[in-house]
Amino acid sequence: MKRPDGAALLELETTARQRGTGLNASVLLGRWRLRSVWPKGEIQASSFSGWALRGLQAELDLRSGEEEQLLLSNAVSIGPLELRFRGEASLRGRRPLLTFVFKTVELTVSGRCLLKREIPAPMPNRKPFFALIHRDPSGWLAARGRGGGLALWELAPAEN
């Protein structure tokens, strides 16, 4: 699978802003592994951040929820230790925005929960989001986060 560089992603982002992406929830479902990140305003991916997040096995997991909602989790792990945020997400607008709210955070070791806490809801106008840019049939997804950084994920192989 050929992944795009920063310049190609910026071109795709311009197109997404002008025309929308046509993406719907069904093409977003799955477990996505973070591959590259570009800091706000940069055309070069951050080598260190990408290396660190790949080393921490950073992932975004999207599943079908009730009605229009998606179930979302974001996790990092080192060996058997995992930190996972869980919540709900929904798509809004033509581009669209994937807005989400984390409800809980969990710390597990080898699948055993050591800590689980509820997370206070953010103010409505401060919800985190990903402005979706492109979902490629070859298995990658690009989006820009609320903080302005650009992220590229790769769809993980389906688990049996």
Regions found by a protein language model. Give the residues of each.
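Soluble ligand-binding/transfer domains with enclosed cavities or grooves
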Residues: 1-160
